Amino acid sequence: MEIKLKVNEVLGLNHVLKTIIDNDKVKINVLLKFRLLGIMHSIESHIANFEIVKNEKIIEYGESDENGIYQISTDKPDAMDIFKKDIRQVLDSEVTININMLKPDEVFDQGLTSEYLMGLYPIIGE
């Protein structure tokens, strides 16, 4: 199913998925883990594209240090403001992801906290 999410929602979803999958204290069944990994794979290109744009903007508005690492100096508020404006445009833009929505019975009563369930909410459907 195709669903539209803002890039910032995709980033948040990726964080929740990664946290659930990597947390040894959360015991989820193998099928749910498989489904969550598949969803992560489906949004991977959007995460990578965001990182590319963000890094390009850091290089554009920032300066490199002696190690060749770019950063935007707080001494240059104009550059930081332009960077934030550019990144906000990307974060607020919509992307389409094609996934099979999670069914409520796949995630409820599976040991996931309410915080995790809230993070998964955009991809839980009937």
Model-derived segments and their meaning:
Residues 1-126:
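A composition-driven surface/loop motif
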